[in-house]
Each structure stands twice: as C-alpha cells, then as structure tokens.
Regions:
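S-adenosylmethionine
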Residues: 104-197
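Conserved SAM-binding loop
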Residues: 88
Length: 204
C-alpha cells in the first residue's frame, strides 16, 4: 500500500486517456493529481482500505487503480466501452495491482460494494446527456452506502435536493478545477477548465 499522496500521484501519471474518445460519453481522463487527492482523502475517511470499491463508468481505470494502490480489498471497474476496459486491464497489470474490470452498462451491474468512487459524464456536451451524472448517482447509492461522485459545481444546488430525495446525506465536498483538453473536433480551445465538486454521499 502506498503511504504518501505524492507517490500515489506519481504511480497514476502514466495511466493513458481513452485512445478514441466518444463525445457523447464525455470520456475525459481524471488527472492524476485529482484522482490521487480524492482517493487519498477517501482512504483517510476509512472508505477504501480493506473494503470493496466500485468505479462506475471507470474509463481507463484511474480511480479504480488508485483505490487498489491504497489497499482496497477488492476493486471493480465498470464501463460500457470495451477499448477503455482493455486499457484499464493493461494498466492494472503494469502497476501490479488486483482489480476486476467489466465491459457492462452500469445499469446492468448487480454487485454490491462498500464504496463507490466515480467520475460520471458531466452532461456538459449534449442536452440528452444532462441527466447522466444524476442517473449514475442514483445507481451508485443502490450499489454502496458511501459514494464519492464528480459533478459540475454549478449543479450543486440541484444535487443537494436530489441527494435528500434519495434519502441520503452529503457529508463532505471536495472542489477541483478540472482541465478539459482539446480531444474533440468541436473544441475551440486547446484546454479549458471547469469547476467541479466531488460529493461524499452517505445513505441514511
């Protein structure tokens, strides 16, 4: 198990982004610095080490791998994209950690866990995706009693109401400036940043 946050970030630096990202799925890689900080904090709160951690919409696996490096007993990453899952499996082999990656729609995932740590689509690109992160949150709370989930900061007020409606409580918040590199043809800038919040949500 890694004992310094800096070492965790260094271990995650070489996790690659998706080779052929689909704009509808908003397949942005969580930066190593943010992934390390969040999973380090989750571990400090007793939500990772020795537990089963699930990553819904795992992409190439950076959050799953971070949980495995921080001593999770079992890690499961789920993503509908087969290319992303294959890359995640390769990264687990490279880092010599145990993690199980499934090519599956998250809505069809039936297992239970102790903690979900996920970065779902922000719903920032298309109107049809604007409910995506909220659907992920509803699913996550069926999988585990504790959820860490990335969302656009501007949706925070709505999410507070949603969490309450789901009979759950926001116990911690982590704020990040999330860099979005120019990976899609419609992007005008080389890189832009969006303000995100990670909610720690606990089922009542």
């Amino acid at each position: 198990m890694i004992t310094k946050k800096r070492h965790l970030e260094m271990a995650l630096q070489d996790v690659p982004p998706h080779p052929d990202p689909d704009p509808d799925r908003e397949q942005y890689l969580t930066p190593a610095s943010i992934a390390a900080d969040l999973v380090w904090n989750a571990t400090s709160q007793g939500d990772v080490e020795g537990l089963k951690v699930v990553d819904l919409g795992c992409g190439t696996g950076i959050l799953s791998l971070a949980a495995a490096l921080m001593g999770a007993h079992e890690v499961v990453g789920v993503d509908v994209d087969e290319k992303a899952i294959k890359m995640a499996i390769r990264q687990a082999q490279r880092l010599q950690v145990s993690a199980r990656f499934l090519t599956q729609d998250v809505n069809e995932f039936k297992e239970k866990g102790d903690t979900v740590i996920m970065n779902p689509p922000f719903g920032a690109q298309k109107a049809s995706r604007q409910e995506a992160d909220r659907r992920f949150l509803e699913k996550a709370l069926k999988v585990a009693p504790v959820v860490y989930s990335f969302h656009l900061k501007k949706t925070e007020e709505f999410l507070e109401k949603l969490v309450k409606a789901l009979d759950s409580t926001i116990t911690s918040r982590f704020y990040y400036s999330f860099p979005l590199p120019r990976i899609y043809h419609f992007h005008q800038e080389e890189k832009r940043e969006v303000e995100v919040v990670v909610l720690r949500v606990e089922k009542r």
